[in-house]
Amino acid sequence: MDSEEIIELERKFIMQTYTRQPIVLSHGKGATVWDIEGNSYIDCFAGVAVNSIGHAHPKVALAICHQAQRLIHSSNIYYTREQVELAKLLTAISPHDRVFFANSGAEANEGAIKLARKFTGKSEIIAAENSFHGRTLATVTATGQKKYSEPFRPLPEGFKHVPYGDIGAMADAVGDETAAIILEPVQGEGGVIIPPEGYLKDVQELARQNDVLLILDEVQTGFGRTGAMFASQLFGVEPDITTVAKAMGGGYPIGAVLANERVAMAFEPGDHGSTFGGNPWGCAAAIATIEVLMDEKLPERAAKMGSYFLGRLRQVLHGCDAVRDIRGVGLMIGIEIDGECAGVVDAAREMGVLINCTAGKVIRIVPPLVIKKEEIDAAVDVLGHVISDL
């Protein structure tokens, strides 16, 4: 089948929930992907910050193939070696003691909300405006963007939103029924919004003073994206609960709720569960992925390459009237422009660079952490060209 036929079949048989780019991808390697016509692209989107170790990493591919020949699924009625090995590894690299396995970031956030309510006996969850936590009914309600939740009313009760970065507003919002505060360390879908210095530490202190749990949604920031294994380490905070997914499995769908011992023990058999969560196949992929992150020092590389990427963007786009801001942490970068950025995405793709437009006016750049300097240079040249033409 050619691209035109595949696109037509998608329109005919698949529910139209996505606005897709008009290319059909075939394969990838490192930070490069190819479409079925043979065109190559520098991937600065990484499947929404998923392919952090690059496409088709041989160690992860081997782990997936090997595990598929042994045991793909068993359910959580039985023990498996791969699941406990991954749980032990996650507690070793995070500030947490116990793990619940899920299949996605939304599932992880659902689990975190349930755990917080069970542990505290309270119902209210405070989230930030402009946030994104998932598309299930609870997580889309926690999400601080009405465009995602309005079509699905009535929504679950017990959620409140305050401006991101405003500690005074957060303090005013905390009350007797507040179970938890859930925040992204850096808002991704909201436009790559970095919190003011000290904000997350102030929220942590506020939560502790009021016996409120702090949940950090590290679905997008986790596993090296910001220049540290977890963004909480970068900002010097220790949340009660952390949610992860995206980059965790190297492309295989897997997520997790990480929690401190005293909080985690609130869950009892039957309180929560998942048929596929923590299956041996996904756990094998995640173990291999995390080992690659550590062995190749990819968090440190993200810090170095992110600094280089930001510097090159600021150099090339200096004085460009269309650019309002260039910001980022590690390899999580946003270019805010004066106007809609969908046209920039199209123009960059036609010149061989894949990027994303979020929050309407922010070009989001989240490439694989293995991206090379020469690939960054090529991507910056393209972005400089298409943005300067605005």
Curated annotation (Swiss-Prot):
InterPro entries listed in its UniProt record: AcOrn/SuccOrn_fam, Aminotrans_3, Aminotrans_3_PPA_site, Class-III_PLP-dep_AT, PyrdxlP-dep_Trfase, PyrdxlP-dep_Trfase_major, PyrdxlP-dep_Trfase_small
Modified residues (N6-(pyridoxal phosphate)lysine): K246
Localization, UniProt: Cytoplasm
Its EC number(s): 2.6.1.11
Residue positions binding N(2)-acetyl-L-ornithine: R135, S274
Annotated GO CC locations: cytoplasm
One MF term in the entry's GO annotations: identical protein binding
Cofactor: pyridoxal 5'-phosphate
Protein origin, superkingdom: Archaea
A biological-process GO annotation: L-arginine biosynthetic process
Family: Belongs to the class-III pyridoxal-phosphate-dependent aminotransferase family. ArgD subfamily.
NCBIfam families, A to Z: argD, PRK01278.1, PRK03244.1
Other notes: May also have succinyldiaminopimelate aminotransferase activity, thus carrying out the corresponding step in lysine biosynthesis.
Protein name per UniProt: Acetylornithine aminotransferase
Species whose genome carries this gene: Methanothermobacter thermautotrophicus (strain ATCC 29096 / DSM 1053 / JCM 10044 / NBRC 100330 / Delta H) (Methanobacterium thermoautotrophicum)
